[in-house]
């Protein structure tokens, strides 16, 4: 399968949430989420294995490798850009990965409107856009409001991991996560290597340019 084999699902006024070719499409600037009946996760995947989720999946190298290596885990790749979704979809099919589904849409919208409480075992956020300029920081993925949704969808003792090359972004994300979650790493709550993490296109890119990579890991408290 080539990336271009995945066709755009809607045009103009036909925009609506739908599942097609193992991809859940959530249109941008769309507000009729209640009109879509989300299938159960067992229906979505065809089994009841535990669910893991990657945000900012990019070209899909990391999540396809993880799904291939862990067939008893169900994986969700969330990526808002359709050109990248096509690449993930192509790699998924060419690798014959059966335990991966793709969400083409905003992570915040997907979490808020399409995921029930306490269903995700682990969330991995790989190299989100740092939006470094002060006037653009409102666009950052890590916000206090989104953290409430993260806590809601994680199971008790569920984990969230962030990988980034931007230390300022890292420190802001740690500050936000500390409000609702427990750090798994000792202070300063981040490390520069995480064992058995795998790698991604962005990680290889930034390391090739001599940039440091930072990882932080937090866990949901039981009963919150």
From Swiss-Prot:
SUPFAM superfamilies: S-adenosyl-L-methionine-dependent methyltransferases (SSF53335). It catalyses: guanosine(46) in tRNA + S-adenosyl-L-methionine = N(7)-methylguanosine(46) in tRNA + S-adenosyl-L-homocysteine. Pfam families: Methyltransf_4. Keywords: Methyltransferase, S-adenosyl-L-methionine, Transferase, tRNA processing. The keyword 4Fe-4S does not apply. Its EC number is 2.1.1.33. GO terms for cellular component: tRNA methyltransferase complex. It comes from the Bacteria. Pathway: tRNA modification; N(7)-methylguanine-tRNA biosynthesis. This is tRNA (guanine-N(7)-)-methyltransferase. It comes from Chlamydia abortus (strain DSM 27085 / S26/3). The lineage of its organism: Bacteria, Pseudomonadati, Chlamydiota, Chlamydiia, Chlamydiales.
């Amino acid at each position: 399968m080539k990336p271009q084999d995945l066709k755009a699902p809607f045009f103009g006024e036909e925009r609506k949430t739908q599942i097609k070719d193992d991809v859940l499409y959530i249109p941008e600037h769309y507000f009729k989420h209640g009109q879509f009946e989300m299938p159960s996760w067992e229906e979505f995947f065809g089994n009841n294995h535990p669910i893991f989720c990657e945000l900012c999946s990019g070209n899909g190298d990391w999540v396809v490798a993880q799904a291939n290596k862990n067939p008893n885990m169900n994986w969700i790749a969330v990526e808002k850009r359709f050109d990248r979704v096509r690449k993930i979809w192509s790699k998924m099919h060419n690798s014959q990965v059966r335990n991966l589904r793709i969400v083409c849409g905003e992570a915040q919208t997907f979490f808020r409107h399409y995921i029930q409480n306490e269903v995700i075992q682990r969330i991995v956020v790989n190299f989100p856009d740092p939006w470094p300029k002060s006037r653009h920081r409102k666009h950052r993925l890590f916000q206090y409001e989104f953290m409430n949704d993260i806590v809601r969808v994680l199971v008790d003792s569920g984990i969230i991991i962030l990988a980034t090359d931007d230390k300022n972004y890292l420190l802001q994300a740690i500050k936000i996560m500390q409000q609702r979650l427990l750090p798994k790493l000792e202070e300063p709550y981040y490390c520069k290597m995480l064992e058995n993490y795998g790698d991604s296109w962005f990680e290889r890119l930034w390391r090739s340019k001599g940039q440091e990579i930072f990882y932080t890991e937090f866990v949901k408290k039981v009963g919150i």
